[in-house]
């Protein structure tokens, strides 16, 4: 019985982790290569790492980690991790 509960909790945790860490399709690779080519011609014009609308650390991000500027949404809040 205990083993069954542990397995169920582990599966639920891994499923939730997969959904939280999944990439948002809005920031996919569809425009990455043309922008990268333009970046090679003019490195100052690079906007690949900038997002128009992102939340600063400490703000509520819900379940969409792509909305955080730092791309880390943990427990529904944007985080900034420094190593």
Curated annotation (Swiss-Prot):
Highest taxon above the source species: Eukaryota
Organism this protein belongs to: Conus achatinus
Protein's UniProt name: Delta-conotoxin-like Ac6.1
Disulfide bond sites: 54-69, 61-73, 68-78
Residues that make up the propeptide removed upon maturation: 23-51
Major localisation: secreted
Domain notes: The presence of a 'disulfide through disulfide knot' structurally defines this protein as a knottin. The cysteine framework is VI/VII (C-C-CC-C-C).
Residues with the 4-hydroxyproline modification: 57, 65
InterPro entries cross-referenced by the UniProt entry: Conotoxin
GO cellular component: extracellular region
Cell compartment(s), UniProt: Secreted
Tissue: Expressed by the venom duct.
């Amino acid at each position: 019985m205990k083993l069954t509960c542990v397995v169920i909790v582990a599966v639920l945790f891994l499923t939730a982790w997969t959904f939280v860490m999944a990439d948002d399709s809005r920031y996919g690779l569809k425009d990455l290569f043309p922008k990268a080519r333009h970046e090679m011609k003019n490195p100052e014009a690079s906007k690949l790492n900038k997002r128009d609308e992102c939340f600063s650390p400490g703000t509520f991000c819900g379940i969409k980690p792509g909305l955080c500027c730092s791309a880390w949404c943990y427990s529904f809040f944007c985080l900034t991790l420094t190593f």
